[in-house]
Amino acid sequence: MESIEQQLTELRTTLRHHEYLYHVMDAPEIPDAEYDRLMRELRELEAQHPDLITPDSPSQRVGAAPLAAFSQIRHEVPMLSLDNVFDEESFLAFNKRVQDRLKSGDKLTWCCELKLDGLAVSILYENGVLISAATRGDGTTGEDITSNVRTIRAIPLKLRGDNIPARLEVRGEVFLPQAGFEKINEEARRTGNKVFANPRNAAAGSLRQLDPRITAKRPLTFFCYGVGILEGGELPDTHLGRLLQFKAWGLPVSDRVTLCDSPEAVLDFYHKVEEDRPTLGFDIDGVVIKVNSMALQEQLGFVARAPRWAVAFKFPAQEQMTFVRDVEFQVGRTGAITPVARLEPVHVAGVLVSNATLHNADEIERLGLRIGDKVVIRRAGDVIPQVVNVVLSERPEETRPVEFPTHCPVCGSDVERVEGEAVARCTGGLICGAQRKESLKHFVSRRAMDVDGMGDKIIDQLVEKEYVHTPADLFRLTAGKLTGLDRMGPKSAQNVVNALEKAKETTFARFLYALGIREVGEATAAGLAAYFGTLEALEAASIDELQKVPDVGIVVATHVFNFFAEESNRDVIGQLLAEGIHWPAPIVVNADEIDSPFAGKTIVLTGSLSLMSRDDAKARLVALGAKVAGSVSKKTDLVIAGEAAGSKLAKAQELGIDVIDEAEMLRLLGV
């Protein structure tokens, strides 16, 4: 008997620990499925030994104590939780228990709802006015979150319509839609603040802020699903009828609530919701099934912590625990280096998962992850599995830190991470095998080297057949080699060779753009070319010197500097020049000596030009002593607006900057 008592003590201690983390700290350490498993184990053991049940056992209550920082509200009607089922057999057994208890052959009608993954709240209205709001807490006493709830736009401060009870306590779930969750985390990453592991944690953390102004900035919403106190009024005699009445009074109710007149219909509802789950826009972890008749609900009553007339039918767990065996680093097509956790395989949401993304070095630091750790893995819908958190309380003794590479694991080039950016990148854009296809496609594109007839499919084949490794290899191709590609005859092959020969004559700006330096678009490339004049001067420029170019800040300057600092990139540039790529020598323009309305002015082009290409317009303006910038600022002297000009035009008008159209530009150019 002693060993059974010890088992019970350990189970209760473990459950209390995780209840505290979940309800009080808003930092759950294990998946819900693992908590449910521990609770089932405790209940089964207590059922076998009822004399060992204690009043403070987690099986006898709902949750954990509320935070001391909030004042407390006592629930006049306890806020109980629901029992769970996890498969069709268990649901059908629940259905039979209800039928047997009612001792009636009549068919039951079930009201089925979504099981929202948020925070349960109670909201009290007196004469239709919101008086107070509280969390579930331990089911008997919750935290007073009235000030925070009043900031949630979905929750009416005053009910609308007629026949509103004198006192009405509605219950529901506060949750955070997926889009809002992503926005909060994006802002947190930008400002270096805490990133939430999932929408449920974000909703709880937002609702339980001591400063309501913070809550007001979070896009929380709410669905109503039940009632607690009802005084001085009446409600319909069915659960669905009550929800519809709440909706008429202005309370939000999910539009997925459905009546089912048989267990088979309930199962159909369950599977349909499971199928739609990835597209809902918010997290759910199952469906809730309730007897629709309020009279039958009353007849069925309650057990210690849950009603007999309702059950939560949970979906297969989207979170499971496993171990990180190693961390490897993948290089994407843009050079982004992503750490990937190699896991001890585990089934998550019906799929065997052996890898999970770790995003970047900041995420590894946030998690405090070490190789060998026990972790929680989450897989939702088609989302790539990710590590949610480390189970620190079960960290093995032999773990080791994750070391982020300083050199690209594919090509060996230096890895850069610009200040203010989370992603580390390979700087060997011209030689890196992982980036090869994308960098070559960019190099030959119309606005870059403009190699006519060399499309994406040709590049794909050239790389796959290992005919081409760097941009310089393109100019060594022969018609004979090209005929080895699919659907490439002798004539087409010769046309491509001719196009490559023609492309050798370009401009300095186009060449810079073709190199694919990160953050260097056409406008920035033109600015760099105009400012430095020669490739040699640009290659020798420091970060400070690069920032003297209009519209070039610290981030772009760092990318340019790191690109030219990488020896492999300089080698490829040397090979390109040796293959005959050239451009006209720069014409030094002194704006003071030019008689032109554009001389010495900083100009921005926006919208579509119909009579002249944007490149030609830029070239003519620069030749007349203008500086062409990519964005509008107080330093801008003139904006030339083509068709469908957008935000740049609006900003120019806001700043009072002169604006002319394409026709006026052509007139001033003398075209």
UniProtKB/Swiss-Prot annotation:
Domain called BRCT: residue spans: 593-671
Cellular component per GO, a single term: cytosol
Cofactor(s), by name: Mg(2+); Mn(2+)
Keyword Isomerase among record annotations: no
SUPFAM superfamilies membership: BRCT domain, DNA ligase/mRNA capping enzyme, catalytic domain, Nucleic acid-binding proteins, RuvA domain 2-like
Reaction(s) catalysed (UniProt annotation): NAD(+) + (deoxyribonucleotide)n-3'-hydroxyl + 5'-phospho-(deoxyribonucleotide)m = (deoxyribonucleotide)n+m + AMP + beta-nicotinamide D-nucleotide
Summary of the function given for this chain in its UniProt record: DNA ligase that catalyzes the formation of phosphodiester linkages between 5'-phosphoryl and 3'-hydroxyl groups in double-stranded DNA using NAD as a coenzyme and as the energy source for the reaction. It is essential for DNA replication and repair of damaged DNA.
Family: Belongs to the NAD-dependent DNA ligase family. LigA subfamily.
Protein name: DNA ligase
Organism: Citrobacter koseri (strain ATCC BAA-895 / CDC 4225-83 / SGSC4696)
